[in-house]
């Protein structure tokens, strides 16, 4: 029976305490649910007080509890059943108190969710709603800090620690002329090019890249050190010749350059391939297998055939494709099913990797990873729910709350808590209901309406409005403003200074978004003579923010920092 939440136990105990039928069973503090009951350590207990435990035992048998759970004395069975079902808890400290010569134990009644109570049903989600709103605001503040700390790309940013003297352009080192190019060592001219494998060509020779009159020395003047006076002039203006581009524009430009070079190579396939790729003749003559110069990025038809014969593969192009290495990493090799039958001859990693037809330069999803219509609609709904116009400053501020029933003040207090729920309470519930417990200040309950705090109006209308306000409002008071999440299904209106388009206009409080109903920055801009508080209207549409006598429930929220400015 441990862990079973038997609400009828709490109802029986509360009814017995309120009836005053048993003299030694009485309340210590009804607001906290503490009471006294005779303990089992007494030798003699009055019969009128012992009758409480006998009636409790009969109630347990009528509710279907097994007799073996009621073994022992009625007082021992009472303590065992109430503690194992989590209905009672012993008070810490002094457990016993002597009343009329009888030792009485101090008990605390634990709350429970009553299914028949409308307020207990909605109180179940209050803890999650409060923590989720605080997490939403915290994520927006962290996102703003990351956006501020994000380094913007600029000319001269180092992409690698080994190339400190060379400026970077879209994570690609830019080739410089002069004495700095001599430090490349054994890397070869191909390692100093951009990702597309294209080297700058002079405008005079752009129309005839394949002409061999001037040789590679005119098209690759950066591989030879120029005179000292020219070096000084060129290095001084190297930043002036470069243009600052963002990542997307730079990648798009490189993509078009790569396409043009591909078309150019296909159109001039009869020319010298080494001459077209821009490799100096002295490098070609001295480059031998195992030498210092790295020319692994260049794949020719001869090298493909030689590697195929050495590997014993009949298909020459397949062998070259297996051994070719993509230095820049910008092209994806695709082998059709006609060339390879069921992946024969390919390594296991190549068979597991999905084949992509085209390369996507942006960071968007692939074709097979694009979301469906249902996911898109769900993301739009969640983005609207978590949308916050201005990122908050996560510093808690004290908030003043004023409540009016038909224009008459019903409650006024100050809340100093990072998040709380303002809701109504069940006027007929007892202390055993979970909706009457504040959960350490999380839940702030509106007072019960009576003749002293209710103005001239329809009492039944006020009762219906308070019933619809059982879920309440989640409120977070920060130095940057007041943030509210509406949990009510009924129509809720508010009058505040945010958004600026609806300044001074009574508008609806959406239940699908977190709204900044009062913004401190907007208050500073408008001046101190304008709106200083936010007014929430529930159950009626007022003619103005000052005349709300005919509205059943009105709540005014005001920050302490704004009050101190007056």
UniProtKB/Swiss-Prot annotation:
This is Viral IRF3-like protein. Interacts with host SKP2. Interacts with host USP7. Plays a role in the inhibition of host immune response. Interferes with the transactivating potential of cellular IRFs IRF3 and IRF7 that play a critical role in the induction of IFNA and IFNB genes. Additionally, interferes with surface major histocompatibility complex class II (MHC-II) antigen presentation. Residues 151-170, 176-236 are annotated as: Disordered. Keywords: DNA-binding, Host-virus interaction, Inhibition of host adaptive immune response by virus, Inhibition of host MHC class II molecule presentation by virus, Transcription, Transcription regulation, Viral immunoevasion. InterPro entries: Interferon_reg_fact_DNA-bd_dom, SMAD-like_dom_sf, SMAD_FHA_dom_sf, WH-like_DNA-bd_sf. Belongs to the IRF family. GO terms for biological process: symbiont-mediated suppression of host antigen processing and presentation of peptide antigen via MHC class II. The gene is vIRF-3. GO terms for molecular function: transcription cis-regulatory region binding. It comes from the Viruses.
């Amino acid at each position: 029976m441990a862990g079973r939440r038997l609400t009828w136990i709490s109802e029986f105990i509360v009814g017995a305490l309120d009836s005053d039928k048993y003299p030694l069973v009485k309340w210590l503090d009804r607001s906290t649910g503490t009471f006294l009951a005779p303990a089992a350590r007494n030798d003699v207990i009055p019969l009128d007080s012992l009758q409480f435990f006998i009636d409790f035992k009969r109630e347990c048998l009528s509710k279907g509890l097994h007799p073996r759970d009621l073994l022992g004395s009625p007082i021992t069975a009472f303590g065992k059943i109430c503690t194992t079902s989590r209905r009672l808890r012993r008070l810490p400290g002094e457990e016993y108190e002597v009343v009329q010569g009888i030792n009485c134990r101090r008990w605390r009644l634990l709350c429970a969710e009553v299914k028949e109570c409308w307020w207990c049903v909605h109180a179940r989600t209050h803890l999650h709603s409060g923590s989720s709103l605080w997490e939403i605001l915290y994520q927006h503040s962290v996102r703003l800090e990351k956006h501020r700390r994000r380094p913007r790309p600029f000319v001269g940013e180092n992409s690698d620690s080994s190339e400190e003297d060379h400026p970077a352009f879209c994570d690609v080192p830019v080739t410089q002329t002069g004495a700095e190019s001599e430090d490349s060592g054994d890397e070869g001219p191909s390692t100093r090019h951009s990702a597309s494998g294209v080297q700058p060509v002079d405008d005079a020779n752009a129309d005839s890249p394949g002409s061999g009159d001037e040789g590679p020395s005119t098209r690759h003047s950066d591989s030879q050190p120029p005179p000292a006076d020219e070096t000084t002039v060129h290095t001084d203006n190297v930043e002036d010749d470069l243009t600052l581009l963002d990542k997307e524009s730079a990648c798009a430009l490189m993509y078009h350059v790569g396409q043009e070079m591909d078309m150019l190579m296909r159109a001039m396939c009869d020319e010298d391939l080494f001459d077209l790729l821009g490799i100096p003749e002295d490098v070609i003559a001295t480059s031998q297998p195992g030498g210092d110069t790295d020319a692994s990025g260049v794949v020719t038809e001869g090298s493909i055939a030689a590697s195929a014969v050495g590997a014993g593969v009949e298909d020459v192009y397949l062998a070259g494709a297996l051994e070719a290495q993509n230095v820049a990493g910008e092209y994806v090799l695709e082998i059709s099913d006609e060339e390879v039958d069921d992946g024969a001859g390919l390594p296991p990693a190549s068979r597991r990797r999905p084949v992509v037809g085209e390369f996507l330069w942006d960071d968007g999803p692939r074709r097979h990873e694009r979301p469906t219509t249902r996911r898109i609609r769900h993301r739009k709904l969640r983005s609207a729910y978590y949308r916050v116009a201005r990122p908050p400053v996560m510093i808690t501020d004290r908030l003043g709350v004023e409540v009016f029933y038909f224009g008459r003040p019903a409650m006024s207090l100050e809340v100093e808590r990072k998040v709380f729920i303002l809701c109504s309470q069940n006027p007929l519930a007892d202390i055993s209901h979970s909706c009457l417990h504040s959960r350490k200040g999380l839940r702030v309950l509106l007072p019960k309406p009576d003749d002293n705090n209710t103005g001239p109006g329809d009492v039944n209308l006020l009762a219906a409005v308070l019933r619809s306000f059982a879920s309440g409002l989640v409120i977070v008071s920060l130095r940057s403003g007041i943030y509210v999440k509406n949990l009510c299904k009924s129509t809720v209106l508010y009058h505040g200074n945010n958004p600026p388009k609806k300044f001074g206009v009574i508008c609806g409080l959406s239940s699908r978004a977190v709204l900044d109903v009062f913004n401190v920055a907007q208050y500073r801009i408008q001046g101190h003579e304008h709106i200083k508080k936010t007014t929430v209207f529930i159950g009626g549409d007022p003619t103005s923010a000052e005349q709300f006598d005919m509205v059943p429930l009105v709540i005014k929220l005001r920050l302490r920092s704004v009050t101190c400015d007056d």
